[in-house]
């Protein structure tokens, strides 16, 4: 296990979470405005990366994500000759699918609807930060070919999923990232697996067993 020390920003934000919890327990906050479930959820996001909570915060060295990237790269280099593969599990900050324009336009008072009607271009929005994109960009920047990195979320049909799993088994795709729900049970890509990275901890203990079961299974050549 690799231990990442909290940044100063994370330490300050944890104090804020504690203050929120005190208010909730004292009954001075409307449960619809704040509650322990929200606080716990925010704590999980903060524990993964401070930029999930506020993407304007700096990308600091030594964080959980950056240590994971370094670890992935080292294993990737060491396993080059045998095309060894890795899985990265992360249930938080997953890739977000883009809604079709036609569907979004049907929503009342949707700004896209008004833009389509008046041909006024919408202002560009800064893409939301996701850990998945951040890791992929950093791996590529350090020399890993883009076609060796894949997100399970991109295989949105059974045919595509079957093709993706085949590429992982043969070592064409060497780093596969996904959530427990999408990459847990039924993901049989163990042939060349050398490492499994848990970036976060799922709610249910059984989900950790599902993750572990992707690599510790019959057919793993390592």
Q: Which residues fall in each region the model found?
A:
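Conserved RecA-like ASCE P-loop NTPase motor core of nucleic-acid helicases/translocases
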Residues: 84-92
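Conserved helicase motor "Helicase C" RecA-like lobe of SF1/SF2 P-loop NTPases
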Residues: 92-153
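Phosphate/oxyanion-binding active-site loops and adjacent basic polyanion-contact surfaces
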Residues: 57-69, 127-132, 204
